[in-house]
Amino acid sequence: MGDPYILMLIALAILATVDLVVGVSNDAVNFLNSAIGSKAIAIRNIMIIASIGVFFGAITSSGMMEVARKGIFNPGMFMFQDIMFIFMAVMITDILLLDVFNTLGMPTSTTVSIVFELLGAAVAISLIKISQNDAESISAIWNYINYEKASLIIFGILLSVVVAFSVGAFVQFVSRLIYSFNFEKRPSYINALFGGFAITAITYFIIIKGMKGTPYYKDVKHLIE
């Protein structure tokens, strides 16, 4: 490995740090916007809760690393320099994209961003490699791209948008029927039931669904299930 790759590794480490700051800022906004806008509690307490949430989310997540490693493309089809170019392009694009969206106050997803950046960079490098090899045609790109896993991930992303919108609209409709605009006149037990259901659903999603695929899940699986 020559000097250019050493410099690229150093650049990747720096870019990863910057990307972490930008990405965490983006995720923190998802915690903060509703809480700050509604003035539910003091901003200081909101920041503490958001920090704890981002911290635990970071240490319990490993699925994204697996996607980056072999979820979108087949690493065996690429040389070391190809992988370096892919990740350099992904890191730079991710920083610029998330920073622009954060600056403009537009919603975005770090997961969706990284998936499509990996796919775009891998396809670009694959096309370059195919163009330099007369024995390969454009159809050979399916050897470079893990299209089954990539298609499943992209379909899941698109489906999650539809499901989230539909379920969210239904829950909002039901909550509006229950509370109308006179929630203070409703019996207190209704608030307790609705709040308990919401907290249970969120906790289930975080613990049961969120921890699956993490290195810690096997240790606590017997306690959960």
Language model feature labels by segment:
Residues 1-225:
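Alpha-helical transmembrane segments and immediately membrane-proximal extracytoplasmic
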